[in-house]
Amino acid sequence: MMRIVEDDLTGDQIGALLRLHMAEAHTNSPAGLAFAFDIDRLRAPDVTIWSLWDGDALAGCAALKELAPDHGEIKSMRTAPDHLRKGVAKRLIAHLIAEAGQRGYQRLSLETGSTPAYRPALALYASHGFVEGEQFGGYVASDFNRFFHLALA
């Protein structure tokens, strides 16, 4: 049975998954355009991260950063390689959307890439109602970056 828990980032499995996430973000992004948070940034008070577990195995993680009292940003969405195509990302994004609503956010945003490596993420966000729009949160627009938003209220 899968379960989602708020993560304190002290476990070996979450550390390994986040290191993989960072490495692939830098591999699949032009220099200077990988904006994945490292584990120290994910510990900041404006960020909450959750992990999804399948028994004792880490299946994925996702974080929510507060940009303003009414605006959140999705960060560090990652499915563990052994759990791809099992609905992990769908469960995590549904959790983030619900949490954003409980926090009173009116808008949820994210930044992602545009190369083939990001196609599954782009499809996931579109399937949950995110629409492409303007840059936000201090990001610099480029041919690589794409920005998506979901109105919650």
What are these model-predicted stretches?
Residues 70, 86, 103-106:
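Short coil/turn segments at alpha/beta junctions that flank glycine-rich nucleotide-binding fingerprints
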Residues 2-75, 80, 93-94, 99, ...:
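Acetyl-CoA-dependent GNAT
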Residues 47, 143-148:
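Short hydrophobic/aromatic beta-strand or adjacent loop that forms the aromatic wall/cage
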